[in-house]
A protein has these predicted regions:
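Intrinsically disordered, low-complexity Ser/Thr/Pro/Gly-rich regulatory segments
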Residues: 1-366
Length: 366
């Protein structure tokens, strides 16, 4: 009976950990078989799942999460997962904050909490918050630090993951989707531009094309954030190029590139352009986004759809998504004439202006 209860207990917390991981999918944009720093993404997730399940079980039992021996932890997880202890050790290290990487992770405010913290050469402290909040964002940052070349060389794989996540919103057979990126060429044969994803709705005759931007979920400096912004806004040229191509050749020609059999029976009557960033899509400065397209982040899309895919009975999903994104206002921009806030710090006062322009106006008016 005790063995049966223990097995049932383990199965319960395994399911609970799996549920936690499913909710964290947005944090890591690499496919399971991608290998970075000696481990596949699947191995990192398997190790994290074990850690989450164990930590939740100990918490529910009322047991304090006391520091554990790293070597014993590695041996236990390697046995449970039937994996090479050396590989498991590398995965454990990637979830650990220590003296070597602390400054890197602390360089930017608001970063993900560490799942594990090294206390000495062989003892690791656990963090329930770190394990159950944004552990894969911590892992992403750490992999970039530990294996920068492999991390960047694998970045192209994130587009396919993003594409599959997008297509999961359109599961019904009424939708036809491009298998991969589509290149659009000029009459001379040179590439004009490309489209990352296409969805065609056979029920309504609407076609949506998507430019997908799979950014890093963080920037370590203003310069890096500016590069991310400029990379995103390069989509202006892509949107313009696709619309010019469509004006010349027609949406039905694009539908042929997506699925020639569908194009023989159906016609594309309306086109909706989209630009989606995995994490970033809205900036307070830089070039003006091409408003012929709907711009949004992936979390924004999930919020607008309540995390649900479109149903077979929905009237016009592509038009609905386009309208929701264009009407949504994710940036809460302060008005220029809003007064500065004052914060008391001892006998001093700190004035916080809504923008640099507001600060300059205040200084010039003195």
């Amino acid at each position: 009976n005790e063995l049966r209860e223990a097995g049932s207990d383990d199965a319960h917390y395994h399911r609970l950990a799996t549920t936690h991981l499913a909710g964290m999918a947005y944090q890591l944009g690499y496919p399971p078989d991608a290998e970075i720093d000696g481990c596949t993404i699947q191995t990192y997730c398997d190790v994290l799942s074990w850690l989450i399940g164990y930590a939740l079980r100990e918490r529910d039992r009322g047991e304090p999460l006391t520091p554990r021996s790293e070597s014993m932890l590695i041996a236990t997880i390697a046995s449970a997962l039937r994996a090479d202890p050396t590989v498991i050790g590398r995965a454990i290290t990637a979830f650990t904050l220590d003296g070597e990487n602390a400054a890197y992770h602390a360089a930017v405010p608001g970063v993900a909490s560490a799942p594990l913290v090294r206390l000495d050469a062989d003892r690791l402290a656990w963090s329930i918050h770190g394990l159950t909040s944004e552990p894969l964002l911590f892992l992403t940052r750490e992999l970039r630090r530990r294996a920068a070349e492999a991390y960047h060389n694998s970045a192209f794989l994130r587009e396919d993951v993003f594409r599959r996540d997008l297509y999961a919103l359109f599961p019904d057979k009424r939708f036809v989707m491009s298998a991969s990126r589509i290149e659009l060429r000029r009459e001379s044969g040179n590439i004009r531009t490309d489209i990352d994803a296409v969805v065609f709705d056979r029920k309504t005759g609407t076609l949506g094309f998507f430019e997908l931007k799979s950014q890093d979920p963080f920037a370590r400096s203003t310069a890096e954030l500016t590069r991310q912004r400029d990379n995103l806004l390069y989509a202006n040229r892509q949107v313009s190029g696709v619309l010019a191509w469509l004006q010349r050749y027609g949406a039905d020609e694009l539908l042929k590139r997506v699925d020639s059999r569908t194009a023989k029976t159906f016609r594309a009557h309306k086109v909706f352009p989209f630009v989606l960033g995995r994490y970033l899509a809205h900036f307070g400065d830089g070039a003006e986004p091409d408003r012929r397209a709907a711009w949004g982040t992936w979390p924004q899309v999930l919020r607008l759809l309540d995390g649900q895919s479109f149903r077979p009975t929905d009237a016009n999903p592509l038009a609905s998504l386009f309208n929701r994104l264009t009407r949504d206002t994710p940036l809460d921009l302060a008005t220029p004439d809003e007064p500065a806030r004052q914060i008391a710090i001892g006998r001093s006062r700190l004035r916080v202006h809504t923008s640099y322009a507001a600060y300059k106006t205040s200084v010039d008016s003195r």
